[in-house]
Amino acid sequence: MLIRFKDKIPNLGQNVFVAEGAKIIGEVEIGDESSVWFNCVLRGDVNFIKIGKRTNIQDLTTIHVWHREFNEDGSLKDAGFPTCIGDDVTIGHNCVIHACKIGSRVLVGMNAVIMDDAAIGDDSIVGAGSVVTKGKKFPPKSLILGNPAKLIRELSNEEVAFLKQSALNYVEFKNDFLD
């Protein structure tokens, strides 16, 4: 379900699948061929959410932002933190993604949490159940695990190739629902 917030309405690219029960609210942009699965909540109410192409947001995931602040004259005082997710990303079931940046070709495992102002570099894996704390930054090709999450090692080329394939698998899954 697409829900207007004030003057902002979600903007979906071509061939995007939004499953029954999913709620996409306000200033949310979703790239072509992406999918938002059952009972997800994407709240672009007090800042924006941008999701790239061929990205899948799996069941029960919540994505939110940190609010912008304005001066009395309406000018921007603090930009807050939007949530920006790259292309070919897989966000596993029941994750919380809050006011952060996730690069392209990233896999975020089930039940992971990524907090405000954190950044995950391209071609990385955040393991299931990991908690990436506020402001933590990880370089490209990172294997990120734990609570609090730590850099374990650099990913191999074979592991990086899997990340793109994982996202492409979900493009096929969502196409089955659109047919």
Give residue spans per PLM region:
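C-terminal segments of enzyme domains that contribute to small-molecule binding surfaces
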Residues: 2-11, 15, 19, 70-96, ...
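Left-handed beta-helix
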Residues: 14, 19-20, 25-26, 31-32, ...
